[in-house]
Amino acid sequence: VAALAGVSRATVSRVVNGDSNVKAPTREKVERAVAQLGYTPNPAARALASSHSNTLGLVTTSYRGGFFGALMDFVQTEAESHGKQLLVTQGRNSAENEWQAVQRLFSLRCDGVILHVRFLSDDRLRQLAAEQRDFVLLDRLVPGLEDRCVTFDHPLASRMATQQLLDAGHRRIACISGPRERPSSRLRLQGFEEAMQAANIEPVACLEGVYDLESGYRCADRLLRQAARPSAIYCCNEEMAIGALLAINEHRLRVPQDISLICYDSGERAPFVRPAL
């Protein structure tokens, strides 16, 4: 390109990289040469020649479920708005797989990585920080890495949901939580328990699901088979609530006339079930 345009390689580099400090006639010569030769920049070569790859990485626990699809969509949209590419991989539900996924993205010279990991230990994450790796943790709070953590006030949200049931007059309330090994699941359950304790009311039951339709259905069915069933159920995510709603319908109960149902978060499907969540 430089030879055809009659300029230096440094000038071509400035034009290709969008440097405004190039005179218009020179820029036009370079652009004509680029078009004539069909030249396209090599991102890998650029990354090797500089300290930046213009690429971000995302590690998710899984690709399954509406949450992860929405997460990837939002992250990619934001990355592209800043001229960045996005590489996505999954941890496949084990600490070793999550660690390999993280190392793989850094080996590909990602400028930074967003981690939505469930099994990777706090010590491993501190090790990454000690290695001066650029990463942000999503929905995870690690002591000593607070400045890298983007999380939510799970206890507050759960207290608000539970309080709504209490304010409606319910006293026989059950909870279907997420997997207890997840910090965020424990925090959601904590908020439910705090609201119940503040009202001096004992929960009917606190069953453990896995944030999917099947576990929500299974736990709700178990609750509804009790001799003294709950008058309200709090589900710690939308998918379990939809599964619970199916069980309620199969028991020929009406929401909210016979039993109330409330859930943490609201995804794309919540408005389309009947009654809408």
Regions found by a protein language model. Give the residues of each.
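Short beta->alpha connector loops
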Residues: 92-95, 116-121, 239
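Amphipathic helical "hinge" segments at domain boundaries
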Residues: 39-104, 108-112, 190-193
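N-terminal helix-turn-helix DNA-binding module of bacterial transcription factors
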Residues: 1-53
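Bacterial carbohydrate/catabolite-sensing allosteric modules
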Residues: 36, 74-85, 100, 106-107, ...
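Short beta-strand scaffold positions
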Residues: 2, 115, 232-236
